Amino acid sequence: MAQRSGKITLYEGKHFTGRKLEVFGDCDNFQDQGFMNRVNSIRVESGAWVCFDHPDFRGQQFILEHGDYPEFFRWNGHNDHMGSCRPVGMHGEHFRIDIFEGCNFTGQCLEFVEDCPFLQSRGWAKSCVNAIKVYGDGAWVLYEEPNYRGRMYVLERGDYRCFSDWGAHSARVQSLRRVLNFF
């Protein structure tokens, strides 16, 4: 059974000031909770969370793990817009992900059980990943750039036959890491 709980507190002002919204589970639209879509600081008290810049779990994703984020550039270098969030499902602490060169699990395949800051350093010949299988207990974050930079995508256990299955507009993936969940 997946662990899908935790607590995240969103603040309108920097450094945990202004109006706040406490969230304990899926929240598909902050405005429905009487909270504007401007978030300038966040405190993750437990769990790992994926936040989206639009309501209904759409748009750019941001992974937030246990800790304080006093200003929005700590999780997003572009703006303070955020519309929805949900806890990341965690099953335990055994991590495994297989990446594939082609859609539908074809072509070159490489397995990871640890973080990888640059896929090409592990023998991955391209900057693209077209399909993924996430096994084991934990979730993973994919990044479009090396060293855990650029647009990110959170993947939980399951099969992703094409990059659009994880919400990407392109197959560009150059680094990946495990989501570590602290309660």
Curated annotation (Swiss-Prot):
<comment type="function">
    <text>Crystallins are the dominant structural components of the vertebrate eye lens. Also plays an important role for integrity and function of auditory nuclei.</text>
</comment>
<keyword id="KW-0677">Repeat</keyword>
<feature type="domain" description="Beta/gamma crystallin 'Greek key' 4">
    <location>
        <begin position="138"/>
        <end position="180"/>
    </location>
</feature>
<feature type="domain" description="Beta/gamma crystallin 'Greek key' 1">
    <location>
        <begin position="6"/>
        <end position="46"/>
    </location>
</feature>
<dbReference type="GO" id="GO:0005212">
    <property type="term" value="F:structural constituent of eye lens"/>
</dbReference>
<dbReference type="InterPro" id="IPR011024">
    <property type="entry name" value="G_crystallin-like"/>
</dbReference>
<keyword id="KW-0273">Eye lens protein</keyword>
<dbReference type="InterPro" id="IPR001064">
    <property type="entry name" value="Beta/gamma_crystallin"/>
</dbReference>
<comment type="similarity">
    <text>Belongs to the beta/gamma-crystallin family.</text>
</comment>
<feature type="domain" description="Beta/gamma crystallin 'Greek key' 3">
    <location>
        <begin position="95"/>
        <end position="136"/>
    </location>
</feature>
<dbReference type="InterPro" id="IPR050252">
    <property type="entry name" value="Beta/Gamma-Crystallin"/>
</dbReference>
<feature type="domain" description="Beta/gamma crystallin 'Greek key' 2">
    <location>
        <begin position="47"/>
        <end position="89"/>
    </location>
</feature>
<comment type="subunit">
    <text>Monomer.</text>
</comment>
<dbReference type="Pfam" id="PF00030">
    <property type="entry name" value="Crystall"/>
</dbReference>
<dbReference type="GO" id="GO:0001654">
    <property type="term" value="P:eye development"/>
</dbReference>
<protein>
    <recommendedName>
        <fullName>Gamma-crystallin N</fullName>
    </recommendedName>
</protein>
